[in-house]
């Protein structure tokens, strides 16, 4: 105890105590942690083999892994084992595959024209197997055909199918021939002498205005219809009078109400 007391008293009077303590802390911080086994090796103890607890761990790791790899995919059926009751071994397929022609058929539904209290209905079935874009193109084509009926008579058109599609042409109509019964001592009027009113398509007709400030209305069938087919498609016929044909054209062009207010029709 006396020696320990003397050491403590000496350290208290030691002027470089703080520096020595700092150097000791720095050395301890740089010192790597080592296992007892490694410390024994540094001390010069000759250890040719690792301790038993290290060997046991290494042996278990090296033996378990190859065993798992060797057992994968090496199932060998036991030929001498008893067969399972109810199991029938089927013969293996040993024939060669042959090419077989496959034909995809579809039931085409024909267009149907129906009549009911609301009028006539035409039903067109959509072709099978169309993609979304093809379906849209098909619908637009049908719509275009329907809208074209405003400008010509579809029933009078010719239909031609080609490799690229369909061609519809306006049929050139021949003038309608009607029998005229002559009347004695009378002179036929211009409308009676004309076999087809469309022959007067370039002849203008004048309607007088109801007000003096307006100019007379002069118009012809050629200005109201682009062709005889268009004239026929909206209800015209060759036996109409010239005036009736002009009035039909005004109604077709939606000008009749305006003309009726301003002119004597």
Curated annotation (Swiss-Prot):
Residue(s) carrying Phosphotyrosine: 14
Residues bearing the modification Phosphothreonine: 62
GO molecular function ontology, one term from the record: RNA-directed RNA polymerase activity
Region (Hinge) location: 171-193
Binding partners and assembly: Homodimer. Interacts with the L polymerase; the association of P and L forms the polymerase complex and positions P optimally for encapsidation of newly synthesized genomes with the nucleoprotein. Interacts (via N-terminus) with N(0). Interacts (via C-terminus) with N in ribonucleocapsid (via C-terminus); this interaction allows to package the L polymerase in the virion and positions the polymerase on the template, since P acts as a bridge between N and L.
Full protein name: Phosphoprotein
Keyword Chaperone: yes
Region of interest called Interaction with the L polymerase, as start-end residue ranges on this chain: 49-105
Pfam family, one: Phosphoprotein
Record keywords: Chaperone, Host cytoplasm, Phosphoprotein, Viral RNA replication, Virion
Organism: Vesicular stomatitis Indiana virus (strain 94GUB Central America) (VSIV)
Annotated gene: P
């Amino acid at each position: 105890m006396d020696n320990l007391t003397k050491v403590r008293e000496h350290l208290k009077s030691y002027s470089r105590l703080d520096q020595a303590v700092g150097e000791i802390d720095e050395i301890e911080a740089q010192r790597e942690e080592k296992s007892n086994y490694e410390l024994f090796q540094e001390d010069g103890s000759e250890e040719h083999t690792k301790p038993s607890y290290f060997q046991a761990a290494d042996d278990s790791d090296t033996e378990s892994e190859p065993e798992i790899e060797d057992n994968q995919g090496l199932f060998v059926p036991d030929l001498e084992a008893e067969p399972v009751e109810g199991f029938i071994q089927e013969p293996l397929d040993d024939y060669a595959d042959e090419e077989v022609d496959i034909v995809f058929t579809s039931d085409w539904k024909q267009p149907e024209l129906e009549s009911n209290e609301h009028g006539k209905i035409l039903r067109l079935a959509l072709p099978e197997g169309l993609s979304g874009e093809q379906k849209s193109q098909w619908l637009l084509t049908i719509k275009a055909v329907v809208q074209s009926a405003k400008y010509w008579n579809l029933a009078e058109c010719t239909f031609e199918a080609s490799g690229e599609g369909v061609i519809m042409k306006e049929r050139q109509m021949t003038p309608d021939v009607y029998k005229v019964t002559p009347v004695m001592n009378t002179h036929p009027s211009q409308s009676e002498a004309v076999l087809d009113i469309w022959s007067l398509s370039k002849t203008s007709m004048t309607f007088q205005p109801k007000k003096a400030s307006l100019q007379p209305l002069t118009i012809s069938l050629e200005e109201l219809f682009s062709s005889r087919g268009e004239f026929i498609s909206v209800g015209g016929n060759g036996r109409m009078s010239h005036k009736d044909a002009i009035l039909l054209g005004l109604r077709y062009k939606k000008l009749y109400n305006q003309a009726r207010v301003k002119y004597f029709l």
